[in-house]
Amino acid sequence: NSGGPIINNSKLVGIAMSVRKESENIGYIVPPPVIKHFLKDYEDARYDGFPNLGIWHQPIKGKLLPEYFGLNPKEGGVLLTGVEYGSSAFGLLHENDIILSIDNVSIARDGSIGLNENLRVDFEYLIDTHFINEKIKIKIIRNKKRISIELPLKKFVQFTPDEHSV
């Protein structure tokens, strides 16, 4: 039932979606936040999609790494290991920057943020709540100095495919 609503206890929990012909008996759900984002984005009769920072990152573990980059003992953040050419972050964020927060939401050392009292999600969820051309505020540590950056979000243009089929 691709395209049909998925209802639980009289509430919409998503829309059924099929991804691949080869994926028989596998059900995928488009959740309400994605549906709402799409509908709001399409109000101008043009779908722009989700923004993407275009970064690679890793968790900050151990005692030496946080100290080396200038993190306080109880402070979180993620270490940037790369920035995609032409992405939203290109030219503004750099390899070895530590992202501390986005829009004043602190990032844990494992890269998660608290969505509510009982649920943590990847910090990039914060980007998914925005639209192309909106700006976000990022606090970083670069060379042991704290910097605040206003970063405009762009549509991500991928130069290579995600997968190959033969």
Q: What spans do the regions from the language model cover?
A:
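Active-site loop architecture of trypsin-fold serine endopeptidases
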Residues: 1-3, 7-36, 105-114
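PDZ/PDZ-like domain segments forming the peptide/carboxylate-binding groove
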Residues: 1-5, 57-101, 105-107
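Terminal peptide-recognition signature
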Residues: 3-6, 10, 15, 30-31, ...
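Solvent-exposed coil/turn segments that connect beta secondary-structure elements
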Residues: 11, 18-20, 33-35, 58-61, ...
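Extracytoplasmic
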Residues: 23-25, 50-52, 74-78, 94-95, ...
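PDZ/PDZ-like peptide-tail recognition elements
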Residues: 36-78, 82, 156-166
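PDZ domains, with a preference for the canonical peptide-binding region formed by the helix
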Residues: 90, 101-139
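C-terminal, low-ordered peptide segments at domain boundaries
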Residues: 110, 125, 130, 137-166
